[in-house]
């Protein structure tokens, strides 16, 4: 299924849903990110691209509270700088981690239900069914144990888990990893449908062409810093991205 093209105008209006200012993070004494500034508007898809080891996954973990960080993270007008993963989820910021492991001995249905901890009764069941509806390939196996799913289908299950709480911002780290081309399009189509329903998405994706077709804006990350911010409908974007990856000056302002 084809993904929808981005709008010709940015979706972000007014105050951003997510605002990251001066964020630095790493692992122990090893610094990875340096002074990251980033914004995402409500209902906007933003692609985060960069070479291997640029710090993309680290940035998502820092935003969601999985890693210690310095700087400021504001979400929905609330200061989340000191918040941990649970506080982030409760606020509507959900992070689907790359390589997320599902509970293989539980059914597909029960895996999705577990993601709705704290919810009860018919509301939870409704949310589970709504999440599975995005992925018919696993919905038809709802009563099968997750161990029977292919690796790509387990990745789809991980994304479905992230949808149960109807996040205001869904952060997807390499959602196409291990998927066939057909299933890649299924996941990215689901992302487009979520955007159309008002959910913002921060997308780390190795399939650059597909990511740019889907996203409204793009940030390029290299050597632990943001080296490019642009709208995806800019004519010179491929050239600017290539220069950004190799450390050349790409500081031209965004088109108005």
Q: Which sequence ranges carry the predicted segments?
A:
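Glycine-rich phosphate-binding loops of nucleotide-dependent enzymes
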Residues: 2-6, 10-256
């Amino acid at each position: 299924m084809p993904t929808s093209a981005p709008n010709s105008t940015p979706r972000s209006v007014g105050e951003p849903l997510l605002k990251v200012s001066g964020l630095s993070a790493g692992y122990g004494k090893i610094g990875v990110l340096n002074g990251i500034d980033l914004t995402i508007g409500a209902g906007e898809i933003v692609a985060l691209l960069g070479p291997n080891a640029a710090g993309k996954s680290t940035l998502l973990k820092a935003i969601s509270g999985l890693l210690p960080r310095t700087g400021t993270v504001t979400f929905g007008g609330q200061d989340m700088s000191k918040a941990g993963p649970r506080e982030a989820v409760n606020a509507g910021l959900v992070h689907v981690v790359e390589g997320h492991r599902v509970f293989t001995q539980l059914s597909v249905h029960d895996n999705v239900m577990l993601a709705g901890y704290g919810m009860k009764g018919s509301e939870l069941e409704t949310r589970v069914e709504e999440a599975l509806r995005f992925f018919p390939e696993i919905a038809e196996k709802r009563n099968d144990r997750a161990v029977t799913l292919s690796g790509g289908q387990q990745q789809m299950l991980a994304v479905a888990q992230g949808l149960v709480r109807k996040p205001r911002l869904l952060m997807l780290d390499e959602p196409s990893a291990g998927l066939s081309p057909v299933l890649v399009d299924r996941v990215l189509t689901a992302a487009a449908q979520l955007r159309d329903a008002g959910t913002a998405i921060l997308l780390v994706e190795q399939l650059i062409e597909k990511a740019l077709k889907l996203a409204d804006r793009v940030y390029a990350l290299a050597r632990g810093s943001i080296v490019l911010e642009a709208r995806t409908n800019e004519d010179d974007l491929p050239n600017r991205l290539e220069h950004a990856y190799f450390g050349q000056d790409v500081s031209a302002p965004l088109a108005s």
